[in-house]
């Protein structure tokens, strides 16, 4: 049986974050070895070339003796309850401690951390806050679950005055303590139940973002985001009228304005990102930025010009009076509900929803009510198309097709002037695409080639 040498760190997982962990340990001159549950992980030969002399063990973790490891550091894609790890997780002190990349980051970081989690909108708020900080003149590093891994940011931005980090539940569940200057929990809806078991387990992982936090930003309309045991100042945001101290939307001079309490900040109409869900994102970023001491004028300038991120409610084209919107990042039911709510109030005609893929065990029934109100039809495809059809067909017309290309062809056939075709799948993409970006690009290319490109 292969064995981890004494005083060596064991890195498990050769994904993007796992390789960042390895680079970090190499820079520090700390001895380590690597394991991956896959027999032939992608990028293995390139990793060996970059780290000569580092042992790599592939295959079941039960076949590896980890008892003498200094520490076990997991890539976020590795479930802590994987056989071979679970005993160390369930019985702390029985062997090496099991942590994730963020534990290593926190040990090294000497600048303030702004951390963002939630089932949806993490990337938008992370990017938005990073732009606000830069506009305010701060040296800012942005990454984590978005873009550059957190550990690489330490090397790439050694003079950063602020780290703005998107953090997933997978990252947080292996983070014993974070100590963020401001931490936001944006929303919670069903996702990753195949990893966390149930909503209680999923929420518990997200709640770790508040460990050691000096300030919390939470959703006034979603009590699941509120800290279980607040140990810091808490600021709430809402897209309704705010209470004293909250961020929200008020009527001011005949217009709707973003506001803190009753103090109007800027007209909603000047926020470039459209939709109620994006107004919530703007308010969350403002609340975090205000706590950090960012310039209010700078934050408003960013909101006036920031268009949002690709594949997140992204307007692609209007053709024959029909608008086509790419929300491929809508990989869970909550994200799709937010997209429908954001678009529904501005519809001239009806909505045509394209949904499907790997539902990760989610309940699709919450989609039925808003679709019954707004939609002409739902067109479903992919692995969980049948489950989507069963959840929706009692409330609105549903057509099941094989793939995204067939769904788009059907949408073009039934759409009328004034309608909006929305790709917001409520599912992961991996049954038919490498990732949600590839799915969104297929949507874009199909439109660019007038249906000639394959999806």
From Swiss-Prot:
The keyword Cell cycle applies. The keyword Nucleotide-binding applies. One of its GO terms (biological process) is regulation of cell shape. It is found in: Cytoplasm. ATP binds at residues 118-124. This is UDP-N-acetylmuramoylalanine--D-glutamate ligase. Its main location: cytoplasm. It is an enzyme of class 6 (ligase). Belongs to the MurCDEF family. Cell wall formation. Catalyzes the addition of glutamate to the nucleotide precursor UDP-N-acetylmuramoyl-L-alanine (UMA). GO terms for molecular function: ATP binding; UDP-N-acetylmuramoylalanine-D-glutamate ligase activity. Transmembrane segments: none annotated. Its EC number is 6.3.2.9. GO terms for cellular component: cytoplasm. It catalyses: UDP-N-acetyl-alpha-D-muramoyl-L-alanine + D-glutamate + ATP = UDP-N-acetyl-alpha-D-muramoyl-L-alanyl-D-glutamate + ADP + phosphate + H(+). Pathway: Cell wall biogenesis; peptidoglycan biosynthesis. It comes from the Bacteria. Keywords: ATP-binding, Cell cycle, Cell division, Cell shape, Cell wall biogenesis/degradation, Cytoplasm, Ligase, Nucleotide-binding, Peptidoglycan synthesis.
């Amino acid at each position: 049986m292969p064995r981890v040498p004494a005083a060596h760190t064991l890195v498990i997982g050769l994904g993007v974050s796992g390789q960042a962990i390895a680079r970090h340990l190499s820079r520090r001159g700390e001895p380590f070895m690597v394991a991956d549950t896959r027999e032939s992980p992608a990028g293995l030969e390139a990793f060996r070339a970059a780290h000569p002399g580092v042992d790599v063990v592939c295959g079941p973790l039960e076949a590896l003796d980890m008892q003498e490891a200094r520490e076990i550091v997991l890539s976020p894609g590795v479930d802590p309850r994987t056989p071979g790890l679970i005993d160390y997780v369930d019985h702390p002190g029985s062997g090496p401690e099991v942590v994730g990349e963020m534990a290593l980051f926190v040990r090294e970081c000497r600048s303030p951390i702004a951390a963002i989690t939630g089932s949806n909108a993490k990337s938008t708020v992370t990017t938005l806050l990073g732009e606000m900080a830069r506009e305010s003149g701060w040296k800012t590093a942005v990454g984590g679950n978005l873009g550059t891994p957190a550990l690489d940011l330490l090397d790439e931005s050694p003079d950063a005055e602020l780290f703005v980090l998107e953090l997933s539940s997978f990252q947080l569940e292996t983070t014993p303590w974070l100590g963020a200057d401001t931490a936001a929990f944006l929303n919670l809806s069903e996702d990753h139940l195949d990893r966390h078991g149930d909503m209680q387990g999923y929420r518990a992982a997200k709640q770790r973002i508040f460990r050691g936090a000096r300030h919390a930003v939470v959703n006034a309309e979603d009590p699941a985001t509120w800290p279980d045991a607040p140990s810091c100042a808490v600021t709430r945001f809402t897209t309704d009228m705010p209470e004293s101290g909250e961020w929200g939307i008020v009527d001011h001079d005949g217009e709707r304005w973003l506001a803190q309490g009753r103090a109007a900040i800027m007209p909603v109409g000047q926020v470039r990102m459209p939709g109620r869900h994006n107004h919530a994102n703007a308010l969350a970023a403002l609340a975090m930025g205000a706590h950090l001491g960012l310039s209010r004028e700078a934050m408003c300038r960013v909101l006036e010009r920031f268009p949002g991120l690709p594949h997140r409610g992204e307007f692609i084209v209007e053709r024959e009076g029909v608008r086509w919107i790419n929300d491929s990042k809508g990989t869970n039911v909550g994200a799709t509900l937010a997209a429908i709510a954001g678009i529904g109030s501005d519809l001239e005609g009806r909505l045509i929803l394209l949904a499907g893929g790997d539902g990760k065990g989610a309940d699709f029934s919450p989609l039925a009510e808003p679709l019954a109100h707004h939609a002409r039809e739902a067109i479903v495809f992919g692995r969980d198309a049948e489950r989507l059809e069963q959840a929706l067909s009692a409330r609105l017309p549903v057509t099941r097709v094989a793939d995204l290309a067939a769904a788009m062809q059907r949408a073009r056939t039934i759409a009328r002037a004034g309608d909006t075709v929305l790709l917001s799948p409520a599912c992961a993409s991996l049954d038919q695409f490498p990732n949600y970006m590839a799915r969104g690009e297929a949507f874009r290319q199909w439109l660019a080639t007038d249906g000639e490109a394959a999806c």
